[in-house]
Amino acid sequence: MKKVTDSFVSLGHWPSAGSFGFNTDILATNPINLSVVLGVLIFFGKGVLSDLLDNRKQRILSTIRNSEELRGGAIEKLEKAKARLRKVKAEADEFRTNGYSEIEREKCNLINSTYQNLERLENYKNETIQFEQQRAINQVRQRIFQQALQGALGTLNSCLNNELHLRTISANIGMFGAMKEIT
């Protein structure tokens, strides 16, 4: 047990390295130096810190202003784009409507043109048929007339003899002579 008590005794002889408690010696603790340093830091640091904070504030405000300007520009561009989109949609609807009406108009024109062509072809066909009928009728008439003439000549040639022929010629000469006297 002697060893334990010796160790406590030896603790009492060590020099004091520092202890908890307040040191009331002003020069030993340097509160004047600390207060001067703190005062200088506060006095000069306040301006520097204020300048740093003002610069930071100005950068933040300019960033906000720039952001607002960009936002305003973006909103303006968006409105322009929306207006242009509405305009393009209206033009597309107009083109679509005009396109449909143009298609309908062309369709009607094509139908009318086709009917006119068909009517013209029908008239041409009817004229051709009438012409061919008239030509056939004329050919038939000509043949009938030729056959009638041939038949009449055949009848006359078979019926006429020289004496009848001479009498007919004399009668015709007499008629020409009478006509000559009248004129």
Swiss-Prot record:
Source domain of life: Eukaryota
Membrane spanning stretches: 27-49
Compartments where located: Plastid, Chloroplast thylakoid membrane
InterPro entries (alphabetical): ATP_synth_b/b'su_bac/chlpt (IPR002146)
Gene Ontology terms, MF aspect: proton-transporting ATP synthase activity, rotational mechanism
Membrane topology recorded in Swiss-Prot or TrEMBL: Single-pass membrane protein
Pfam families on file: ATP-synt_B
Gene Ontology terms: cellular component: chloroplast thylakoid membrane; proton-transporting ATP synthase complex
Keyword tags: ATP synthesis, CF(0), Chloroplast, Hydrogen ion transport, Ion transport, Membrane, Plastid, Thylakoid, Transmembrane, Transmembrane helix, Transport
Keyword Ion transport: yes
Note: In plastids the F-type ATPase is also known as CF(1)CF(0).
Function: F(1)F(0) ATP synthase produces ATP from ADP in the presence of a proton or sodium gradient. F-type ATPases consist of two structural domains, F(1) containing the extramembraneous catalytic core and F(0) containing the membrane proton channel, linked together by a central stalk and a peripheral stalk. During catalysis, ATP synthesis in the catalytic domain of F(1) is coupled via a rotary mechanism of the central stalk subunits to proton translocation.
Family that this chain belongs to: Belongs to the ATPase B chain family.
Quaternary structure, from the entry: F-type ATPases have 2 components, F(1) - the catalytic core - and F(0) - the membrane proton channel. F(1) has five subunits: alpha(3), beta(3), gamma(1), delta(1), epsilon(1). F(0) has four main subunits: a(1), b(1), b'(1) and c(10-14). The alpha and beta chains form an alternating ring which encloses part of the gamma chain. F(1) is attached to F(0) by a central stalk formed by the gamma and epsilon chains, while a peripheral stalk is formed by the delta, b and b' chains.
Descriptive protein name: ATP synthase subunit b, chloroplastic
Organism: Ranunculus macranthus
Source species taxonomy: Eukaryota, Viridiplantae, Streptophyta, Embryophyta, Tracheophyta
